[in-house]
């Protein structure tokens, strides 16, 4: 049996439940402190601990000063990336762990995207392909656009867990990308296979999309192992930036 949850965490859970119940959206202010103290039946210190915890989780922004207070935010994959990096540091796991996970996950994600993507999702992928080609000579832009393609495919799978998990994995592998460069031919090949994956998804061909994604991630991993083995072998360290 686990330890009982602290009162502040229980209150934090109730605050999130109340946000959902009221249908609060990003930018909404929560009730003032005196009303929250009365509603949750706790002391000021406990309530503020709950709010600080939710701020760390990306649920709230605590705006100081008159007219401030807790404001609803949209959590993102950064918090998950920070938590995963902390867990993986304690396991002394190398960055190659992330590439192994991507190799296992992304073919399935591409197959799901083929069946579930909508017109808006296809348009976002097409725009990403255009930008990647347009900014091919810019190393930083190429890397960002390339990772963004995979994020878009993950969210197009219709599975929010895959979306957030991939956001986190993408954020973690970015930490290993420091110093990693891609020659012009490698960037062109990436554009080509991204375009082929997009075509398979647009055609509703799940088998081809899955096969192409598997080949793409395997080839990318082989390139990193050959050219940047030390980066992949480096242990993951806790990254609060996510």
Question: What residue spans do the PLM features occupy?
Answer:
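Short linear motifs at protein or domain termini
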Residues: 1-103, 231-232, 238-242
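Conserved amphipathic alpha-helical segments that form helical-bundle/coiled-coil interaction surfaces
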Residues: 98-179, 190-196, 208-222
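C-terminal effector-binding regulatory domain of bacterial HTH transcription factors
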Residues: 208-242
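Surface-exposed helix-capping loop/turn segments at secondary-structure junctions
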Residues: 23-27, 115-120, 206-207, 228-231
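Short helix-capping and inter-helix turn/linker motifs at the boundaries of alpha-helical repeat units
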Residues: 185-188
